[in-house]
Structures are given as C-alpha cells and as structure tokens.
C-alpha cells in the first residue's frame, strides 16, 4: 500500500510540475529553472540588484537565480555560488560544489569571496523534504540561520539579503533576528511560488552598521 501511495503522490507531482505555466515558460526561454521567475518578481518590487554588484548565491543549483542575477549585475558584476549539487558552468559565476554546512566548504567559500565585502546574499537553500513538518522545519531553519551567519561575515553595510524560509516553528524568532540587522524587512510570496507551499521569501535591505 505504501508503494502505491508514493507512486500516486509522485504522479500527481509530475503532472502538476509539467502543467505549471512557469515550468513551461522556463523551458521555452531556455532558463535553468522556474525559480528565475520568483527572483524576477522580487527584483521588480524590491530592486535588490544593480550593475557591478558582487552577489553570493547559496543553494544555487541548477542555476536559475545565478542566471537571473547575471542579467542584472552585468559583466562588471560577480557571482559566487555554492550548492551541494552540481551545476553546469555559467559565464560570470564562480561555482563551488559542496555542503555549505561543512566547515571546510564554508571556508573555501569565504576564500572565494575574499577580503572585499559583497552587496547581496541570496539563499534558496532547502533540505530534502520528508513531508513531515516536525522534521523538515528544523532542518530548514538551520540552513537559513547559516545563511544569516554568512551575511554577518561578508555582507557590506547597506547590503541586501534574500532568503527562502518555510513557515513554521522558529519563523517569528528568525524574522525578529533579521529585523534587528536590517533597516527594512518584507515578506514576499511570488506568484511563481506554489500556493500550497509553506515557502515565503524574506527580503531584507540596508544592513545596519
């Protein structure tokens, strides 16, 4: 019975995925993922990126966000990306494959960033989901805390932070923590984000000194 349930669930997901208008548009435009549209909507409202910026992209694979950011920061900008999964090379993107939770990977990422502070940190990281919130939410919150720690290390004063968060236990505390570090904080649910998903995006601008 369990196998049948998993099979039915997988079939529903595949049907939903391939009938999704954003998946279809991404395929037509040659984009790496539908996440491109989420970031485009956020950029239209919040103007996180400008030409020449240096951006850190956490949870980057397959590259939808890096692909979008590259169009906004131009040839003089720089993207340092990291993911546990592989990602095909992209012009203007310095990609590190590894588990961001491991100290050696984090150190390698910091070395790639170098001495200069960055203007934006974005995180689309998410754990492998089990479907059980009591298991998934703590794993997700651990990742977003690490992303915020990265901001503390590398984000310049006045810099911006965008992070995907799954609503649940720990969300309100995390939001308060971000508000203490940034001058303006908003919560976004882009149209391209599936309605049934717990995910929202916290947009934090103007890192405080």
Swiss-Prot record:
Its EC number is 2.1.1.166. InterPro entries: RNA_methyltr_RlmE (IPR050082), RNA_MeTrfase_FtsJ_dom (IPR002877), rRNA-MeTfrase_E (IPR015507), rRNA_MeTrfase_gammaproteobac (IPR004512), SAM-dependent_MTases_sf (IPR029063). The keyword Methyltransferase applies. The active site is at 164 (proton acceptor). GO terms for molecular function: rRNA (uridine-2'-O-)-methyltransferase activity. CDD domains: AdoMet_MTases. GO terms for cellular component: cytoplasm. Gene3D superfamilies: Vaccinia Virus protein VP39. It is found in: Cytoplasm. S-adenosyl-L-methionine binds at residues 63, 65, 83, 99, 124. Disulfide bonds: none annotated. Keywords: Cytoplasm, Methyltransferase, rRNA processing, S-adenosyl-L-methionine, Transferase. It catalyses: uridine(2552) in 23S rRNA + S-adenosyl-L-methionine = 2'-O-methyluridine(2552) in 23S rRNA + S-adenosyl-L-homocysteine + H(+). The keyword Chloroplast does not apply. It comes from the Bacteria. Belongs to the class I-like SAM-binding methyltransferase superfamily. RNA methyltransferase RlmE family. Specifically methylates the uridine in position 2552 of 23S rRNA at the 2'-O position of the ribose in the fully assembled 50S ribosomal subunit. This is Ribosomal RNA large subunit methyltransferase E. The lineage of its organism: Bacteria, Pseudomonadati, Pseudomonadota, Gammaproteobacteria, Enterobacterales. The gene is rlmE.
């Amino acid at each position: 019975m369990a196998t049948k349930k998993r099979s039915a669930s997988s079939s529903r997901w595949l049907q939903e995925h391939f009938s999704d208008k954003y998946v279809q548009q991404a395929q037509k435009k040659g984009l790496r993922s539908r996440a491109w549209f989420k970031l485009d909507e956020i950029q239209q409202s919040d103007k996180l990126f400008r030409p020449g910026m240096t951006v850190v992209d956490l949870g980057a694979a397959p590259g939808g966000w890096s692909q979008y950011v590259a169009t906004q920061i131009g040839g003089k900008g720089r993207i340092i990306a990291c993911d546990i999964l592989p990602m095909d090379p992209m012009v203007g993107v310095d990609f590190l494959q590894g588990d961001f939770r491991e100290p050696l990977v984090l150190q390698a990422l910091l070395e790639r960033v170098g001495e200069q502070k960055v203007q934006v940190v974005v995180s689309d990281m998410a754990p492998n989901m089990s479907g059980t919130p009591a298991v998934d939410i703590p794993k997700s919150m651990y990742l977003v805390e690490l992303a915020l720690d990265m901001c503390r290390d590398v984000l310049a004063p006045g810099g911006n932070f965008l992070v995907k968060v799954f609503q649940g236990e720990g969300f309100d505390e995390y939001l308060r923590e971000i508000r203490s570090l940034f001058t303006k904080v908003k919560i976004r649910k882009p149209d391209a984000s599936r309605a049934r998903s717990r995910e929202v995006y916290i947009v934090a601008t103007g890192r405080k000194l």
